[in-house]
Amino acid sequence: MASITLTPSEKDIQAFLEHYQTSLAPSKNPYIRYFLKLPQATVSIYTSGKILLQGEGAEKYASFFGYQAVEQTSGQNLPLIGTDEVGNGSYFGGLAVVAAFVTPDQHDFLRKLGVGDSKTLTDQKIRQIAPILKEKIQHQALLLSPSKYNEVIGDRYNAVSVKVALHNQAIYLLLQKGVQPEKIVIDAFTSAKNYDKYLAQEANRFSNSISLEEKAEGKYLAVAVSSVIARDLFLENLENLGRELGYQLPSGAGTASDKVASQILQAYGMQGLNFCAKLHFKNTEKAKNA
């Protein structure tokens, strides 16, 4: 029988109770605030704030609190380095890449914390758990600022090769700290052939083999950790850049970015956009023609 223990916020507990209020049932345990009998699972909410979910459907109901079960795929139960990047699709902000080293004995802690793919977590949740991950998990974080990004793109790198360089460097630096992974997984952003081609121009190399896997953040906790930390780093950078210019910079590359880009261009010229945005995006031309 599956058993999951979580410590969600009181707000999330109340939202869960409201959603499943018809399943509330009495309990003789004085330490249980609320007890719910749900299809294929029972949920005990303790006075301490902890929640115990038991039964075949435990994972389903735990997902309400951000819990994400990680498939027991090949290599998941090995000491593992996983990498991911955030910011590649956003006009404003830098490009954050993180490599994290996770061992099997850390899996329960990470699952209880609610670690999953950063794409499924709210920014608020990411900002909440990222500091804990940074403290507890060995990792290497890199941030390429927009101005530095603009400097290297079109010169030595393109949008793909620069990510190869950053992923490679993050792994290299993490290995230099003495971690000993039995597997290294990169959340695939290009083919293995392309990765190897661009890797050939990098000076820092290592002998460990790597595996590029699509949707790796949903398969490996090490990649999920990197995804969360990278998202947090990107959001922090976005806030700092916007604060310096006096604008709230949106994530992404949609119409909201077009509008702010036009305003920054009028206020600061191209120097302002070079400071906070990736200039090769189409948003730049739209701002010029606005």
From Swiss-Prot:
Its cofactor is Mn(2+); Mg(2+). Pfam families: DUF3378, RNase_HII. The keyword Cytoplasm applies. Its main location: cytoplasm. Its EC number is 3.1.26.4. Disulfide bonds: none annotated. GO terms for cellular component: cytoplasm; ribonuclease H2 complex. Endonuclease that specifically degrades the RNA of RNA-DNA hybrids. Belongs to the RNase HII family. RnhC subfamily. This is Ribonuclease HIII.
